[in-house]
């Protein structure tokens, strides 16, 4: 079923932004593993223990799903057809003028962050491109899609 799911600012397949860890686990019928990304345990990044969602990560802030990240090529795409491996040019054509571009924090140009906001700083999709101009990671969800190093 994951092959037909779209990654949107609202979620992925049956998974919705705002769900608890248990709700996400039940929706996917898979155990989530991972660890806290901060000392307080308020930010956790988890991944499915197996199955078709390899390279998918779920960020929980204060117990609620805030971001879904896809970091490996596969079947999952945005509703506009963008996937890990798409070119920055394909992202620009798909999302048009509403796309915000900024330089990547750790990789030289042409690597960049291309962000599409459904509602500014509240819900959106961020495409992280690499030095080859291709999408390396897609983040979708709340304003946490802007976080560069885990929860920071």
Q: Where are the predicted features?
A:
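N-terminal low-complexity, Pro/Thr/Ser-rich intrinsically disordered segments
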Residues: 1-14
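Surface-exposed aromatic
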Residues: 7, 72-77, 108-117
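N-terminal post-signal-peptidase region of extra-cytosolic proteins
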Residues: 8-10, 39-46, 73-78
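Extracytoplasmic/periplasmic, Sec-exported soluble proteins
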Residues: 12-16, 79-83, 119
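A cross-family detector of function-defining hotspots
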Residues: 20-62, 83-142
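Mid-length scaffold segments of soluble, non-membrane domains
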Residues: 68-71, 81-84
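Short, low-complexity, Pro/Ser/Thr/Gly-rich segments in the mature regions of secreted, periplasmic
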Residues: 139-152
